[in-house]
């Protein structure tokens, strides 16, 4: 499909939960439920066992996949590697997998055991840096951080429990790989766009709740904007999809693009 449709880039298709799986939580996918960990975290002892697990060699298969994809892609087609953000991974880890209650368990830890939550976020940050470093070394031309559940955090808590760690990851990768673009996507994060841009990322991803023109103004000339067509648009017929895409493109002037 990459060659057939001439996409601007290819992205490594992988689950963001490869990191907690490598940390010993034994990821499984249950029909009718979704992702579930066979070794969930219930207390401090469980947490300490998980954060002390070395994961690098357990994720070699992802590096091999990146290398194989890069070798088979056209040289002019960039490959985007990615990882989940520390906060988003913590949501799944402390929730035992998927959630139908907006990850109430991690939010409970946030207010009752913040020190333990921070301990987990710090460890995840280091694991993510190593994971993305491996992808870059194996051929990823850009990387993207997905904070799929950042929007669950309050206005005051997002900078503490998500943004702080996103910035740590971007800063370290900028030091080691200054020419590799780094994109940050926070679902429901429109209110924090200015702060996200200040992580010194190369681009921001925005969802359909954010005005594209406003986002571009916040991003400025040195930060790209990715998004923001509502995926549900694809449920419409072909003419409707074309109309919505054109509307999106026409919302920016040539200079703004």
Predicted segment positions?
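Short, conserved acidic/polar surface loops in the N-terminal third of protein domains
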Residues: 21-25, 40, 90-95
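A short acidic, glycine/proline-enriched capping/turn motif at secondary-structure boundaries
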Residues: 16-19, 34, 44, 86-88
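Short, flexible active-site-proximal loops enriched in glycine and acidic residues
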Residues: 9, 37-39, 78
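A charged helix-plus-loop insertion that forms the helical arch/lid used to bind
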Residues: 27-43, 99-107
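N-terminal basic, low-complexity leaders that serve as flexible interaction/assembly modules and, when applicable
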Residues: 1-31, 168, 242, 249-250, ...
